[in-house]
């Protein structure tokens, strides 16, 4: 959430930032709401002060046996109480109107984010690894998985409908191995603390990270009002909600391997075959909580941690910076890491690493107190996939496929596979 004080002082900056995102100007509307609220608050405060003063004057008039004045003051206090009973409710309503309006405004892109309308305007930063030249036509992961007998979309559809997968045998173990490998890397070498968070959260948590109120259609909700997490970013970031964290302990770095649940609203017709776009999938998430001065450097560090996963797996990838029109709602800047999929002959996103500034910290009311200062500041937050486990499985299958349809297991994963070096067709 943006600071209304900042918006009052920088209306043109806000509207220019919204224009970069392809959105209409909103500063005038927001400032008008704020002025209406501030004017009303002024009236309420004046009425409260007069009520308190008149109440004291009643006592003085009674002591002086000036009953006429006392009665007039009592009548005035009664009128003020009646006014305040309605006015304080109006104040809450006006404050909510402003808060609701602010909650739908996206974050302000950093100055170095490239301008653009959509993913075609994203800017490539680097490529690591060269795509393998196959001596045969490489297959897509779902062709390989079904031929091996370990990937079953038909039974998954029978159980749950479209966009689900059943993995069996060594492919199920390979997905588990990938998640464990990523967690071990991030916790033992990258300094992240592993967390096993709830998979269902309250409204406040999803609001804090920015999925609510604007993107509720992308989420699954239980009958008792909880939300299935679309990413572990939600519970990990909200660990510090409504808290003042010790600045000496910053940065806080959390990681988790969880199922994620998404309705994929608006994705009709996209990636309908295979595991690329699922309602349920595994992902390793990284979250950092920092002070204001450290978040830019932390963004580079987090992205490097995600890239290291793919380097260890020997998977070719590229890193791009998203343009203003392709960034997520809460991000100030986002790096996408795209892995090479030879079956599709293209790069596909496998990780997205974003710095959000104090946007989420303000929504969560998560703060820290700089050393030597009495006042607090909102924390800066960052999140990144480290990485999407299902997509990593896809990438391993396609990049390590053999002409006979078997899958070579990358060396980094073999210790997690009981020494198995190849996945072959089920007997």
From Swiss-Prot:
Report the locations given in the UniProt record.
Cytoplasm
- Can the keyword Protein biosynthesis be found in this entry's annotation? yes
Keyword presence, Ligase: yes
What EC number(s) would the UniProt record show? 6.1.1.11
Q: Name one GO molecular function term.
A: serine-tRNA ligase activity
Offer one example of a GO biological process linked to this entry.
Answer: seryl-tRNA aminoacylation
Segments forming a coiled coil: none
Task: Give the multimer and partner information.
Answer: Homodimer. The tRNA molecule binds across the dimer.
Biological role stated in the UniProt entry:
Catalyzes the attachment of serine to tRNA(Ser). Is also able to aminoacylate tRNA(Sec) with serine, to form the misacylated tRNA L-seryl-tRNA(Sec), which will be further converted into selenocysteinyl-tRNA(Sec).
Quote the entry's note on domains. Consists of two distinct domains, a catalytic core and a N-terminal extension that is involved in tRNA binding.
Family membership? Belongs to the class-II aminoacyl-tRNA synthetase family. Type-1 seryl-tRNA synthetase subfamily.
This chain belongs to the protein called Serine--tRNA ligase
Q: Which organism is it from?
A: Brucella abortus (strain 2308)
């Amino acid at each position: 959430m943006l600071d209304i004080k900042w918006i009052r002082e920088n209306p043109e900056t806000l509207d220019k930032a919204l224009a970069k995102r392809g959105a209409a100007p909103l500063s005038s509307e927001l400032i008008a709401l704020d002025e209406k609220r501030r004017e009303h608050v002024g009236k309420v405060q004046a009425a409260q002060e007069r009520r308190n003063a008149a109440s004291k004057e009643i006592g003085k008039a009674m002591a002086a046996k000036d009953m006429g004045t006392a009665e007039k003051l009592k009548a005035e206090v009664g009128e003020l109480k009646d006014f305040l009973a309605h006015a304080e409710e109006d104040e809450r309503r006006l404050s909510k109107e402003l808060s609701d309006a602010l909650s739908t405004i996206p974050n302000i892109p950093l100055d170095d984010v490239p301008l653009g309308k959509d993913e075609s305007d994203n800017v490539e930063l680097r490529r690591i690894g060269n795509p393998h030249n196959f001596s045969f036509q490489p297959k897509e992961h779902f062709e390989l998985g079904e031929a091996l007998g370990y990937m079953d979309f038909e039974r998954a559809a029978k159980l749950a409908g479209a966009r689900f997968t059943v993995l069996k045998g060594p492919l199920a173990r390979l997905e588990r191995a990938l998640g464990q490998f990523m967690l071990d890397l991030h916790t033992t070498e990258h300094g992240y603390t592993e967390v096993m968070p709830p998979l269902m959260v309250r409204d406040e948590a999803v609001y804090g990270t920015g999925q609510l109120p604007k993107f509720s259609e992308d989420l699954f909700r239980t009958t008792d009002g909880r939300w299935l997490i679309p990413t572990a970013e939600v519970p990990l970031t909200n660990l510090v909600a409504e808290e003042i964290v010790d600045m000496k302990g910053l940065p806080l770095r959390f990681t988790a391997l969880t199922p994620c649940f998404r309705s994929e609203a608006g994705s009709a017709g996209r990636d309908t075959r295979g595991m690329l776009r699922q309602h349920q999938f595994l992902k390793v998430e990284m979250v950092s909580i920092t002070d204001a001065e450290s978040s830019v450097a932390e963004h580079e560090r987090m992205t490097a941690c995600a890239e290291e996963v793919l380097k260890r797996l020997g998977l070719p990838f590229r890193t791009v910076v998203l343009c203003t029109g392709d960034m997520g709602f809460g991000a100030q800047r986002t790096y996408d890491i795209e892995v090479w999929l030879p079956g599709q002959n293209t790069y596909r996103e496998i990780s997205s690493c974003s710095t959000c500034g104090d946007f989420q910290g303000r929504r969560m009311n998560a703060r820290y107190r700089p050393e030597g200062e009495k006042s607090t500041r909102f924390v800066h937050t960052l999140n990144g996939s480290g990485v999407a486990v299902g997509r990593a499985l896809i990438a391993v299958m396609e990049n390590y496929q053999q002409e006979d349809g078997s899958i070579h297991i990358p060396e980094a994963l073999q210790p997690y596979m009981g020494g198995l070096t190849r996945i072959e067709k089920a007997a």
